[in-house]
Amino acid sequence: MEKKLSSENNQLSSENILGLLPHRYPFALVDKVIENIPGERAVAVKNVTINEPQFQGHFPERPLMPGVLIVESMAQVGGIIVTQMQNLPKGLFVFAGINNVKFRKPVVPGDQLIISCDLLSIKRQRFGKVKGEAHVDGKLVCSGELMFSLVD
């Protein structure tokens, strides 16, 4: 699939995202990118709905989005940045680590996560690091540094 951007603010549709990332249901956790500076920064939207499978067990009486899925959403936005870098070898970049992750508020069905990631570094064209933040209604709900590695 060709990596096309929409004309407005370098946004990416869900179809564009599927062309950049290997994730599919139920792990496609980015609905659209609303700001995209390839290789530098991305801001994305994840709409949290009660229909998502994790809410059957986490928790039926009080559904909360698992923190690991918030972090995975941030990692996918970071992956969008890294996969668009022209000077890197082609291949699969995988989530390789996290530092300083903090969860500040619960995320529940009906929330809209606004996820921003900024590239911090690329080393030896194989390892990347981004700073990620997730907000709901303008309030920070999660932040941390995420690392990626190119798999041969």
UniProtKB/Swiss-Prot annotation:
Gene3D superfamilies: Hotdog Thioesterase (3.10.129.10)
Group of enzyme by EC: lyase
The protein's name in its UniProt record: 3-hydroxyacyl-[acyl-carrier-protein] dehydratase FabZ
Source superkingdom: Bacteria
Record field: catalytic activity: a (3R)-hydroxyacyl-[ACP] = a (2E)-enoyl-[ACP] + H2O
Species in which this protein is naturally found: Prochlorococcus marinus (strain AS9601)
Pfam families: FabA (PF07977)
Residues annotated as catalytic: 58
Example of a GO cellular component annotation carried by this entry: cytoplasm
EC number per UniProt: 4.2.1.59
Family, as annotated: Belongs to the thioester dehydratase family. FabZ subfamily.
Annotated function: Involved in unsaturated fatty acids biosynthesis. Catalyzes the dehydration of short chain beta-hydroxyacyl-ACPs and long chain saturated and unsaturated beta-hydroxyacyl-ACPs.
Intracellular or extracellular location(s): Cytoplasm
One example GO MF annotation: (3R)-hydroxyacyl-[acyl-carrier-protein] dehydratase activity
InterPro entries, sorted: FabA_FabZ, FabZ, HotDog_dom_sf
Keywords: Cytoplasm, Lipid A biosynthesis, Lipid biosynthesis, Lipid metabolism, Lyase
Xref: HAMAP family: FabZ
